[in-house]
Structure formats: C-alpha cells, structure tokens
A protein has these predicted regions:
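Conserved catalytic cores of very large enzyme subunits
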Residues: 1-183
Length: 183
C-alpha cells in the first residue's frame, strides 16, 4: 500500500487491515491448520483417523532420532500443505472473478469505474486473496513441549509420547501414566 492508503485503513473481517474503498480482496479463502500438519508429521504423513496420506512423511514420531529430524519432517509437511492451500486460494480467486460478478460493490470501490472493470477483474487498486492460518499457537506450543520434554530434558521417550497420543492420554497403566504425560 502507499503510505496514504496504509494510514486510511479499517479492519476487514476479524484481522485484516485494509485501505478503505480501494481493495477487492477475499479474506480467509482457505484455513490451513498447522496443528493438523503437526499431527500428520507425527504419523508419517497419514491422518490417524482416516488413514489417508497425501504427502509421504519422514517417518513416525518414534523414528525421529533428533529434534532436527522432526523439524525437517514438519517443514516437509507444512510446505506441501501450504503449497496446496495457495493453489486452492488461486482457484477460489479465479472462480470469484469468472463466476460471481459484483457490479454494485464495484461501483463504490475506487478505480473500478475509471478502469472500466469489476472489482474482481482488476478494477480495484489492490486485489489479493489470503488464507487465515489456524492452530499456529497450539502447534508452536506442542513443538516447544516436544523439544523440551523429549529431546532436551528426556523426561519421556518418543515411544511413551506416541502411546499417550494414540490413547488420548487415557492409559493409566503406563509409567508415567497418560494423565501424567498430559500435565
């Protein structure tokens, strides 16, 4: 944005600062879930509930010998899914442009009339689509906990953590118990 446009902003939706009357963006087109990517990373790229695997992982949780091994596996999964979210956002963007004309909105957005184009066909001064990532903080907390509890302090093994995750921390016959690991 220009400095002047950046100073004349409002919040679009929940979080997106936007210059008023000058934007044709669609916000929250896709919602990449970082916590789901973490779950896939811990299960060799497979969804533990469905068994579906879109991106082959670098192994299961118990296969990671170092924290760096885990980080590389997570990056691989995250890059795969973010790439596909961008593709999905672009498809949504093109679909809106081709299938959903919006002449009224175009009439009140600066530059559309001067350019002779609708808001989604290049009429607005600014036009973009952005996904709203979810689960980032939960994912970061889980990764920090994994690093500290398993790799840095060795309080539990990867096998113990895997069992606790697979049993939803409900197995109280292990030492430590699932509940103790959860806390």
């Amino acid at each position: 944005y220009s400095y002047e446009d950046a100073c004349d902003y409002g919040i679009t939706g929940c979080v997106e600062p936007s210059p008023q009357g000058k934007i044709g963006g669609r916000f929250g087109a896709s919602f990449p879930n970082h916590t789901k990517v973490l779950e896939l990373t811990l299960n060799d790229g497979k969804d533990p509930r469905t068994g579906l695997q879109l991106c082959k992982g670098n192994g299961n949780l118990t296969d990671f010998k170092t924290f760096d091994d885990f980080v590389e596996a997570f990056k691989k999964q995250l890059n795969f899914y973010l790439k596909h979210h961008i593709i999905a956002d672009n498809i949504i963007d093109l679909s809106w442009e081709e299938l959903i004309p919006n002449p009224f909105l175009s009439s009140v957005i600066e530059d559309c009339i001067a350019r002779g184009k609708e808001i989604k066909q290049g009429g607005a001064k600014y036009d973009y689509t952005g996904g709203q990532s979810v689960g980032i903080i939960s994912c970061a907390n889980a990764i920090a906990t994994l690093k500290k509890v398993v790799f840095d302090e060795g309080l539990i093994t990867l096998e113990q953590l895997k069992h606790a995750l697979d049993t939803n921390f409900e197995d109280n016959t292990t030492n430590p118990t699932g509940e103790e690991i959860r806390r």
